[in-house]
Amino acid sequence: MSRAALLVLADGRFPAGGHAHSGGAEAAVKAGRITGAESLEAFCRGRLHTSGLVTAALAAAAALGVDPAALDEAADARTPSPALRAAARRLGRQMMRAARATWPHPELDVLARRFPKGAHQPVVLGLTARAAGLGPDDAAYCSAYEAVSGPATATVRLLSLDPFDATAVLARLAPDLDRVARAAAEAADRAAAEGVDALPAASAPLLEIGAEAHAAWPVRLFAS
């Protein structure tokens, strides 16, 4: 295993399509819930401990070898918004393309055939980590970081927020990232022993509501 593979996978320039999605930040900016660095930090912390925990646990479980089809079904059950489910599958399809080109692996091929329109992104992320020789802890960290880095980067574009301030927000969230990644990896261990019902099912209703409203906008900067 090369831990450097984690740097490649977590790099915002990895061609997995995440740059086109705001993680709910665009809807939150329009609603006035994100107005600057302080409110961005609150938004990211809330997202991290809810949907971020869910996706990190799914990714960790996939990296651990839990059945990806069962994990995909679990992801559907934990994503009430049709718009978010569709976005997760689009991102999963794009990540699959990047993963198969970067770390070819039979398990990726099997998942791609089973879900030709895309499996949920965290499931693909976890299986990609597995293909790269990484472990469930690595997958959990990568997914948890995506949960906050996406909105932070999007807010720089949406509000012309100083990139230094956005990066400082991410740095202040580091202890939360540690806690969420650790909880996600522990949940993945339970899922391997007890089944996917052992995975967390934390919810963030405003993210779901905002995603549905955002999907209906005639003009928007981000896909979700």
Indicate residue ranges for each PLM-predicted region.
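Glycine/small-residue-rich interface belts in oligomeric ring/scaffold proteins
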Residues: 2, 6-69
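C-terminal auxiliary extensions adjacent to catalytic cores
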Residues: 4, 33, 37-42, 131, ...
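A short glycine/serine-rich beta->alpha loop
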Residues: 6-15, 42-49, 77-84, 110-116, ...
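Conserved active-site and cofactor/substrate-binding residues in soluble primary-metabolism enzymes
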Residues: 15-23, 35-39, 50-57, 86, ...
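Short glycine-/small-residue-rich flexible loop motifs, especially phosphate/cofactor-binding loops
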Residues: 25-26, 126, 153
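Generic structural signal for hydrophobic core residues of well-folded globular domains
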Residues: 27-32, 47, 51, 62-66, ...
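Internal, conserved structured core segments that host functional sites
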Residues: 56, 61-134
